Amino acid sequence: MSRTNMDTRHAHSALLAAPQSATANSRSSNSSSESSSNKNNINVGVGDDSGNVSAVSIDDGPHFRDIFHYGHEENYKLASSGITNLNSSSHAHQTLSPISISNASTPESFPEHPLGLERETEPALEAEMEAEELPPHQSKYLLSSIKATKRLKDARPFLKPVDPIALNIPHYFNYVQTPMDLSLIETKLQGNVYHSVEQVTSDFKTMVDNCLNFNGPESSISSMAKRIQKYFEKKLSAMPPRVLPASALKKTSRNRKKNEDMDSPLVIRRSVSTTNDNIGESGNREGVSGGRPKRTIHPPKSKDLFDIYENSKPKSKTLQKKFRTCLKILKVLMSKKNSDINFPFLQPVDPIALNLPNYFDVVKNPMDLGTISNNLMNWKYKTIDQFVDDLNLVFYNCFQFNPEGNEVHSMGKKLKELFNFHWLENQDILNEIETDSDLEEDNYSSSYSSDDEYDDEDINENDITNPAIQYLEQKLKKMEVELQQLKRQELSKLSKERKRKHLGKTLLRRKAMKHSVDDLKKSITDKINELSDLEMNGMIRIIKNSLPADEILTSNEDEIEIDLDILDEATIARIYERYFEKKNNNNSKRKLSGNYSTAPTNKKKKTLKFLEKDEIINNNNYSDSEEDSSDSSDSDSD
């Protein structure tokens, strides 16, 4: 069967066929001469030995009219050319070859199309298609731009295709006829589906338009879509041109050769002959290029190097100590112990998952504890004030979006109180003044070597997962509980015994005091007349101070009546200690000294006798006897 090449895009038909036999050649020439006087151009292609015409094209003057397809065992009429019944019974068993009937004035070319379309051959089409493919350097740049766009916070709703079932939006496809997302654009770029930059931007615009049509132009998701579109357009403004300059092409080819040399295996050649060397060399190169893909080497980006330099460890040891303290405080806020109040603030807020479409309308600067922890670990803060500002921003966003009385609002208040408590607790470290002496000598070495120390301090005991250690810890806890119980039991026993002893001593003391107070009263009554006037006045003053105001002592000019029963025990003891105790001690000394000397005993006997005589004297001579007794007592003391 012969081949008919047709340019389907420009609607021109052309017949290219080779004669199959000498008979076919003669028929072709005869038919072309017969139709030389005809005004119409007829191209007939026959590709079947059974007499079936595959295609016929008719050009009536300068205009293209129609293309007819003929089937088996059917009769067709061509009104413009006067050809009828091509597949009649008389020609059913004839072998027809391709026939070309053209105008005599233009035997080698087709007439010009009224729309200005020109005839093109298949090699020209292939060349044009190759020229329309996206250059590798532009494809690579677009792919990196899409990946950078996916890393934005605003790009989260556009990373994956929209799932109407999971998001409970069954009417999504009523508004969106052509779904599009960033992952699909990235996949198409990796598969070399795009042939121009405009196709990529068109898909990106389709994704943004879908968002605006479904969510409305004033929605927070729509504003996120506009922001990532602005970012992507900014990336496109720095895209390299489609055709690189000659210097860039030479540099690219040089890099490719260098990569090929690096990827090619080591070849040991034998110096047998020049022919063998060439064969072996070409064979090895073909094997390497066809065996495995070449690895592309990507140079590090200047931005990454800038980040490494910018986020280096601070020189000041005091500042490092402050940041470690901040990290410890942050770990307390993020610990499982406080999970009942910290879980809404651990990760960035997802408005889609939490069904909060107006979140970014209220919160302009989102912040969370996880981001703050990452910034601390990577030394992104230069001062502790930046850390405090970000932490206060978390609480501010919470109070701004959640009204007072909301559960999340109360959680934020409790978490802020906890932070303030630990912050005040570590004021000694946080208020240390930085000096020049605590600067590290070599910043470059310290920024890498001291990271290990920082990591060691961050190790927590909760990270230990050894079962033997965990078993021993549990056993120690049980033993500590048992030890505390035993201590409590022993202390209760000791306290009971001590109370019992103290109670017995108290009862004995009370009994002894009862007897001793009676003895004191008796001794005071017996020796009250032995006091001098000065001592008597002091004793009366003590008694008056101890009595209440309404109690008045009954007194005459010469005598004062005192009832000792109305005095308390403390007053009686005080009177006795001040005025009568010394006298009793002196009397006891006299008794002891009387055992060894005879003179005092004689005096004592005389005194006693004198006192006995004085007792017989009547009341009228009482004062004289008192003076005599006082004189006798003075002589005894001498």
Swiss-Prot record:
Molecular function per GO: core promoter sequence-specific DNA binding; histone binding; histone reader activity; lysine-acetylated histone binding; TFIID-class transcription factor complex binding
Modified residues (Phosphoserine): 264
Biased composition (Polar residues): 271-281
InterPro entries: Bromo_chromatin_reader, Bromodomain, Bromodomain-like_sf, Bromodomain_CS, NET_dom, NET_sf
UniProt keywords, alphabetically: Bromodomain, Coiled coil, Cytoplasm, DNA damage, DNA repair, Nucleus, Phosphoprotein, Repeat, Sporulation, Transcription, Transcription regulation
Gene3D superfamilies: 1.20.1270.220, Bromodomain-like
Source organism superkingdom: Eukaryota
Ranges where the Bromo domain occurs: 130-239, 317-426
Record-linked SUPFAM superfamilies: Bromodomain (SSF47370)
PROSITE patterns: BROMODOMAIN_1 (PS00633), BROMODOMAIN_2 (PS50014), NET (PS51525)
Biased composition (Low complexity): 25-43
Modified how: Phosphorylated by the casein kinase CK2 complex.
Domain NET: 506-590
A biological process from GO: sporulation resulting in formation of a cellular spore
Localization per Swiss-Prot or TrEMBL: Cytoplasm; Nucleus
Any one Pfam family match given in the protein's UniProt record, by short name: Bromodomain
Function: Transcription factor involved in the expression of a broad class of genes including snRNAs. Required for sporulation and DNA-damage repair. Prevents the spreading of SIR silencing at telomeres and protects histone H4, but not H3, from deacetylation.
Additional remark text: Present with 2930 molecules/cell in log phase SD medium.
Record family assignment: Belongs to the BET family.
Protein name per Swiss-Prot or TrEMBL: Bromodomain-containing factor 2
Organism: Saccharomyces cerevisiae (strain ATCC 204508 / S288c)
Lineage, highest ranks first: Eukaryota, Fungi, Dikarya, Ascomycota, Saccharomycotina
Gene name of the encoded protein: BDF2
